[in-house]
Structures are given as structure tokens and as C-alpha cells.
Amino acid sequence: MKIAVVGTGYVGLVTGTCFAETGNTVICVDINEEKVKKLQNGIIPIYEPGLEVLFERNIKQERLKFTTNLQEGIKDAKIIFLALPTPPGEDGSADLQYILKVASDLGHLLENYTVIVDKSTVPVGTAELVHNNIKKHAKVDFDVVSNPEFLREGVAVEDFMKPDRVVIGTSSEKAKKVMEQLYNPFIRQGNPLIFMTERSAEMTKYAANAFLATKITFMNEIANLCEKVGANVDDIRRGIGTDTRIGKRFLFAGIGYGGSCFPKDVQALAKTSKDHKYDFQILDAVMQVNHQQKTRLIEPLKAFFNGDLKGKQIAMWGLAFKPYTDDIREAPALENIQVLLEMGAKVRVYDPEAMENVKQIFGEKIEYADSPYGALLNSDVLMIITEWPVFRTPDFEVAGKLLKNKVIFDGRNLYEPSDMTELGFVYHSIGR
């Protein structure tokens, strides 16, 4: 099948590459000439495990191509995916200008019946707006379908190739058959294609992310209370996670969520609620608690230094919002670095993938180590912000000698408190 993907960001690139892997001919379109040139030369602008192998294979076999020309990219395409950014406005609403502009352009360019698919995360009712923008100019039949992505950064290729489910919003039987044909290779193990209306599909995406953000936030609140009452949040997690009604995932306490999805989508759903005069109180609480949780380690850090961090050297392990990605959007590390700098501290950081992205924000205001141990050298204390595997079993004897004080502030609960005490460390974690 001939497929066009408009937008070569995270979602667009994974979508295009994975569809090419199942034998489709895919052309990805982007207005960024420099980005397209790099992609044509085999350079991927994001870090995502497993993507590079598929990308190189499908470029070599000429199933995956890139262009800046929309007309060229969509020619003879049976399906056109819109994987465009929907950045939040100041009021939390999703900015649809890119999607609606492309929709208008498509109206002028469509030559045959085509299925237009919203892959971006968009507010309820967007499929209708896209349909109307295309219809103003189109001379052929078309359908607009909502097909939200449920990719997790770090395991996006696996999520795409072996989905838990595929949600498709359409009221057209013709479009339904096209989408069934497209996704058939991905659901051979029995995971469902779930058909619903376009509005329900758009709402499903927001509901899923808001629920997961709420689950994370609830456990962080439990962790904070555990510290007050002398309980251990790890015990609580095991105690409730074995209840099949609750499940084991997204129960790890820490210093909050970040990334390109949860913060933006919770905010957008809250804005949708306000627009419809519904007071979605849980979402407001989730956003407030998560904002506070990101800098949860600052208070015990200040207490250790008697309130004065001026001139103190802080080592920081982890910058990306989660492991296995270089994405720093809404990452807790950013807020912690900013607060530490404002308090007069010096910061030296290490992350396996995200340091170049952080350098674009902080430049020379902080130091960048070439290894985890390099960050520790002559630092007063260590803060752990992201749970990269490389941080899970360090040589604590070496770490203790490099640090001025054997003190760790762990925002991801990587180590057992009793083990750290035995090793002679002062160890602060979350909810334990």
C-alpha cells in the first residue's frame, strides 16, 4: 500500500518506518529542508532503541523515502497520516494551526479517494475540523479517521509492531476496510482493532494519558504520606499492585512525570473540560501535585546544607524525562537544575543520551561529565533524577571516594535504604 506521513517528528518517524517494515511504500513529508536532507542521508534526529535498524533497512530497500514537497509525497497515496505537532498554548489548549494548514493544502491536492488519518494527539472534534478544511477545496471523495498513537518513548518500535490495541475512529465503512487492511499485520496475535466514532477515539487518547498521569501522581502522594507516618512506599506498591483491579504498572514513586505527552495531554483535557463548563477537579490536582513533586528533593538537600547551597557542587545523574530517550521536554531535571542555579549551587550532570539537548538550554551555566563517575569528582552530593540502567549498580566504593560527602538524594528509589546505610551513605529517597 502507498502511504504518506506528514511530519517527521517522533510519532511520524516511528509510524512511517514501522509501516514500511511490513511492506508498504512510505513517503514522509516535512517542511524542514535540513531535517529531510539528514533523513535522506540516513541520519535519525531522535534516539529510540530499535528504530535505526528498521530505518536503515527500509531506506536501503527503497520502501521509505523523504521529501519536502507535499504534492510529491501524497501522490497516489491511499492513506495520508497527519503526525504534526500540537503544542500547548498559554491556556493549555492544543494549537491546531499546523494540522489545519496541511488539511487545507490537501484539499487542493487530492486526486483520488484517500483516507486522511489524524495520528497526532488532538482535542475532541478535530477530525470534523480537518474534514471541513479539506472539503472546502476537494474535488474527490475522502474520509478523515482518528487513529491515536499509544507509543512509549524508549519502547516505541515494540509498541507499534506489537500493539496492545489499535483504536480507530471512523463512521465510514469504506475507511474502516482500508484501515483493517493496513493494520492486519500488526494484530495477528489477536490484539484488537477497536472501532468507534472519531470523537470517542480522540477522547480515548486523552483519557488514557490522563489516567496514567493520575496513577503516577497518586502513588507520589502516597509516598509523601509514607514519609510522614513511617511506612515504606515499596511495600505499599507490592501490596496493592498484586490486586488485579489495580495492576503493577505505573506504581513506582518518584519525582513526577514529564515528557511530550502526559503534561501536555492532561493540560489539554483540563482545558477541554473548562471549555465545556465542567470542573474536572482531579486533573487540576494532578497538575499541581506533579509540579511540586518534580523538586521534591530540594527541601532535604537544603536541610543537609543548612539552607545554604551557595558554591556547593551538585552531581546529577539523569536528564531525560525517562530512560531510553534523549527527550527532555518537561523533564524534572530541568526544574531542579534551574532551582539549584538560582540558589547559587554549581551543577555537574551526566546522562547517556540527553546532554546535548540540555546544553541547548543551559549552555555553559552547568558542567557536563563524560561518565557517571566523572560527575561525582569533588562534588558535595549526588542527585539521581532519571533511572537509567547504568545508574542501578554503580561501584559504591569508588563513588564514595569521589564524593566529598557520601550523600545521595535519589528521586527514583534505585537502591535499598538498608544497603546504603550499611555502605556508609546518607541516603534520601522518596516515600521510604
Please annotate each region the language model reported:
Residues 1-432:
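Structural/interface elements that position substrates and couple domains in central-metabolism enzymes
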